[in-house]
From Swiss-Prot:
Zn(2+) binds at residues 73, 75, 243, 318. One of its GO terms (molecular function) is zinc ion binding. Its EC number is 3.5.2.7. The keyword Zinc applies. Pathway: Amino-acid degradation; L-histidine degradation into L-glutamate; N-formimidoyl-L-glutamate from L-histidine: step 3/3. This is Imidazolonepropionase.
Length: 408
């Protein structure tokens, strides 16, 4: 057989739902890679003969291989920090109170408007490197800290540039409807007009976004405004997604389902009607335990209902300076289990196969199947559950991206 590399002495958590074993596991396995794709995968005893002198062979020492991790919700391109707000919250101020007083997102907006692309790129690269060291091979990056055309484009350009200069694949999302900027404080409809008539066409003209998102909440945009933005995005051929039901239930999830959104994110206040709508539309539910933890929330997402209706559950870091300044997907695995009571298998699916579904890339990544992209990680663990169980010592030993060993 003519392959580019072979991995042996490994166990593989394929996350392939067609394999009935937990995690889609194949023990005592082997993987062969050719032209950036998985060319062979199965028990080591069934591996076809190959020329060991001409093909690199990597030995996993009994460790576990999983698909490369996918962080499907981040805001990692930003300047400044909001440690002062952290102190205010610890003194009793709420997220909404800080936002209504001009803090929150707006303080980061001011920092991003002042920063140039080089500064934003350097900051973003540091954060992307941190995720990559934990086995992340694909990440979604949102804008939303510009709230004017120039800065929104600047953030998206930086996100695209990060993807061009890093082995991690970057999917970009235009989130101009993240908050109402100060200059439109009493005219949110006017700002929505600006998003639809000027920002979105400019984003499309430079091919800067794969999807469009809206923060649908009382402190941001109402249902009518949300639908206007997402309908315009859909008409332009872009995927749509939604921040919804984080602080209240406004029916955003049902709107997302009706529009065929790829995902609805946060969803702490999601009700059964919303869950049913997501199930019927195939929309993913993105769980963000980092924000739940950092904001000290108490309303948990309806995990049992999501299970009951078979809604794909995604885990993501929501890395951002205000509500989840936590640049770690491995910690999300632990938090997803300890805070939301996911099983370790559900948590890992949330950072692999279901995360790929949320980004619309499940045909290429998210599980280990012959013909899919060779994105995978070797972990020094005895069982896949260990990834969610323990935190603090990074067990990621090797990362293969597009068939190339990028971290060892």
């Amino acid at each position: 057989m003519s392959w580019d590399q072979v991995w042996i002495d490994v166990n593989v958590a394929t996350m392939d739902p067609s394999i009935s074993a937990p995690y889609g596991a194949i023990t005592n396995a082997a993987i062969a890679v050719k032209d950036g794709k998985i060319a062979w995968l199965g028990p080591r005893s069934e591996l076809p003969a190959f020329d060991v002198l001409s093909i690199p062979v990597y030995r996993g020492k009994g460790g576990w291989i999983t698909p490369g991790l996918i962080d499907a919700h981040t805001h990692l391109v930003f300047a400044g920090n909001r440690a002062n707000e952290f102190e205010l919250r610890l003194k009793g101020a709420t997220y909404e109170e800080i936002a209504r007083a001009g803090g929150g997102i707006i303080s980061t907006v001011n920092a991003c408007r002042e920063a140039d692309e080089a500064e934003l790129f350097d900051l973003g690269r540091q954060r992307l490197n941190a995720l990559a060291k934990e086995g992340v091979t694909t990440v979604e990056i949102k804008s939303g800290y510009g709230l004017d055309t120039e800065t929104e484009l600047k953030i998206l350009r930086v996100a695209r540039e990060l993807g061009q200069h890093h082995h991690v694949d970057v999917k970009t999302t235009f989130l101009g409807a993240h908050a109402v900027p100060p200059e439109f404080k009493d005219n949110s409809d006017g700002y929505v007009d600006l998003i639809i008539n000027k920002m979105l066409p400019a984003v499309i003209a430079e091919n800067l976004a794969d999807a469009v998102d809206v923060f649908c909440e009382n402190i941001a945009f109402n249902l009518e405004q949300t639908e206007r933005v997402l309908s315009a995005a859909k008409a332009a051929g872009l995927q749509v997604k939604l921040h919804a039901e984080q602080l209240s239930n406004m029916g955003g999830s049902e709107l997302a389902a009706r529009l065929g959104a790829k995902s609805v994110d946060h969803i702490e206040y999601l009700d059964e009607a919303g869950v049913k709508a997501l199930s019927e539309s195939g929309t993913c539910a993105v769980l963000l335990p980092g924000a739940f933890y950092f904001l000290r929330e108490t309303q948990k997402p309806p995990i049992d209902l999501l299970r009951q209706y078979g809604v794909p559950m995604v885990l993501a870091s929501d890395f951002n300076p205000g509500s989840s300044p936590i640049c770690s997907t491995l910690l999300m695995l632990n938090m997803g289990c300890t805070l939301f009571r996911l099983t370790p298998e559900e948590a890992l699916a949330g950072l692999t196969l279901n995360a790929a579904k949320a980004l619309g890339i499940e045909e290429n990544v998210g599980s280990l199947v012959v013909g899919k992209q060779a994105d995978f990680c070797l972990w020094d663990i005895a069982t896949p559950a260990q990834l969610a169980y323990s935190y603090g010592v990074n067990p990621c030993k090797d990362v293969v991206k597009n068939g190339k060993l990028v971290h060892q």
